[in-house]
Amino acid sequence: MSNFLPFSRPAMGAEELAAVKEVLESGWITTGPKNLALEDAFIQLTGNQYAIAVSSATAGMHITLMALEIGPGDEVITPSMTWVSTLNMISLLGATPVMVDVDRDTLMVTPEIVEAAITPRTKAIIPVHYAGAPADTNALYAIAERHGIAVIEDAAHAVGTYYKGQHVGARGTAIFSFHAIKNITCAEGGLVVTDDESLARQLRTLKFHGLGVDAYDRQTWGRAPQAEVLTPGYKYNLTDINAAIALTQLHKLEQLNARRHDIATQYQHALVNLPFQPLALPAWPHIHSWHLFIIRVDEQRCGINRDTLMEALKEKGIGTGLHFRAAHTQKYYRQHFPDLSLPNTEWNSERICSLPLFPDMTNADAERVITALHQLAGQ
């Protein structure tokens, strides 16, 4: 269908092509100066002391958990309303993911829910800044400090998200994603920010074979030939081709997110006259990056269920997404946690639908979605 409106499309242009061309012509296409520039730019954005670029947010989560020495016998608290990679990384390290419920209307963990899940085995909390809105990090950090456990902010949705005047992640350790549908993208990539010098050093070692230097050394303009393996590590470094694209996108972040905000506002105004329920906005001061615009499709209220709506929109040439099916309902986790019940998560998991939202959308594109929702409501 030539006029199909996808759920998401990356906003790429001449600047990204020029950035890639520059790297290709430089003769250094793997981890190099563009990685350093990207890390420095993120430090400027978030205010953290350290930034470590990696091949994906999942890779960043893996080595952050490893650096915190999380393993067998440990518990990590995470919402089930998240992408399964977080649960997978916890499980692969031999630790136990403690999946908790979320607020029914923001789909984020609350301090009360998190504190109730803490046990003597708890080593970390992973709150998710969901859909571009910030979790209540001050309250969560207060709980973590009281119990002596780590906080790892899942900021995959949150480049450009601010909480009480600070960019998310500014207070501690956070992981960002540059996946193809994210607010800034380089197809695949991620980045960890932190103020912990020891953690940053371990992440740089773990992301590149356990070597004592990064893939690209600032002083030697290349890999130090005397580099030694300090610990077994991984191949999680980001190429400069990807880093150059991400850096170019980061320079355009304000305008990219402003366009997302405009489309989201158009949706919000339209939903006043429709039965579909958007997510509630957090009560605390914040700037939303509008990674996703999610509606809840309750059949009793809307006259149509979520799956039928998504299929009907597809037939009208409109793509949608599902973020996310609750992790504890996936086969592996269902088998390992058969008695787990998370009512708010489950209610939303059966009803959430992500509408098209990306910077290159026009107002007419958004109006097309709104018109289709009007046509389908009550069917």
UniProtKB/Swiss-Prot annotation:
Entries under InterPro entries matching the protein: ArnB_NH2Trfase (IPR022850), DegT/StrS_aminotransferase (IPR000653), PyrdxlP-dep_Trfase (IPR015424), PyrdxlP-dep_Trfase_major (IPR015421), PyrdxlP-dep_Trfase_small (IPR015422)
Transmembrane segments: none
Catalytic reactions on record: UDP-4-amino-4-deoxy-beta-L-arabinose + 2-oxoglutarate = UDP-beta-L-threo-pentopyranos-4-ulose + L-glutamate
Matching SUPFAM superfamilies: PLP-dependent transferases
A Pfam family recorded for this sequence: DegT_DnrJ_EryC1
Summary of subunit composition and partner proteins: Homodimer.
Sequence similarity: Belongs to the DegT/DnrJ/EryC1 family. ArnB subfamily.
The protein's name: UDP-4-amino-4-deoxy-L-arabinose--oxoglutarate aminotransferase
Source species of the chain: Escherichia fergusonii (strain ATCC 35469 / DSM 13698 / CCUG 18766 / IAM 14443 / JCM 21226 / LMG 7866 / NBRC 102419 / NCTC 12128 / CDC 0568-73)
Lineage start: Bacteria, Pseudomonadati, Pseudomonadota, Gammaproteobacteria, Enterobacterales
Designated gene of the protein: arnB
